[in-house]
Amino acid sequence: NLLQFNKMIKEETGKNAIPFYAFYGCYCGGGGQGKPKDGTDRCCFVHDCCYGRLVNCNTKSDIYSYSLKEGYITCGKGTNCEEQICECDRVAAECFRRNLDTYNNGYMFYRDSKCTETSEEC
């Protein structure tokens, strides 16, 4: 769920999802259009695509289990939806960590109206 995803992001990056990732670029936060602005925004694009492949799953509220050991997130057992949501969130949180050095404060609270390029396919 969203609270778990926020916790995962904090554990991986040291940053809170809000404000650092909730409204970043063209894809972080609700919806998305255009081309991802940088590596961090691409993490969100891939996360959106991952969620988009999940059928009949409540990505915002399904509670999953995971553990953090020696800096690695491991998703636990649960329903098919819970396990898949956890994997989508884990991959995104790790992607955010890999892209910390290119995080651009100029893309925080970025306006959707600036995301006018043709959207990519998942």
UniProtKB/Swiss-Prot annotation:
Disulfide bonds: 26-115, 28-44, 43-95, 49-122, 50-88, 57-81, 75-86
Cofactor(s) for this UniProt protein: Ca(2+)
InterPro entries registered for this protein in UniProt: PLipase_A2 (IPR001211), PLipase_A2_Asp_AS (IPR033112), PLipase_A2_dom (IPR016090), PLipase_A2_dom_sf (IPR036444), PLipase_A2_His_AS (IPR033113)
Main location: secreted
Keyword Cytoplasm: no
Recorded catalytic activity of this chain's protein: a 1,2-diacyl-sn-glycero-3-phosphocholine + H2O = a 1-acyl-sn-glycero-3-phosphocholine + a fatty acid + H(+)
Entry's localization field: Secreted
Expression (tissue specificity): Expressed by the venom gland.
PROSITE patterns: PA2_ASP, PA2_HIS
Free-text comment on the cofactor: Binds 1 Ca(2+) ion.
Listed GO MF terms: calcium ion binding; calcium-dependent phospholipase A2 activity; phospholipid binding; toxin activity
EC number in record: 3.1.1.4
The keyword Disulfide bond appears for this protein: yes
Function: Snake venom phospholipase A2 (PLA2) that inhibits neuromuscular transmission by blocking acetylcholine release from the nerve termini. PLA2 catalyzes the calcium-dependent hydrolysis of the 2-acyl groups in 3-sn-phosphoglycerides.
Similarity comment text for this entry: Belongs to the phospholipase A2 family. Group II subfamily. D49 sub-subfamily.
Record protein name field: Neutral phospholipase A2 agkistrodotoxin
Organism from which the protein derives: Gloydius halys (Chinese water mocassin)
Lineage summary: Eukaryota, Metazoa, Chordata, Craniata, Vertebrata
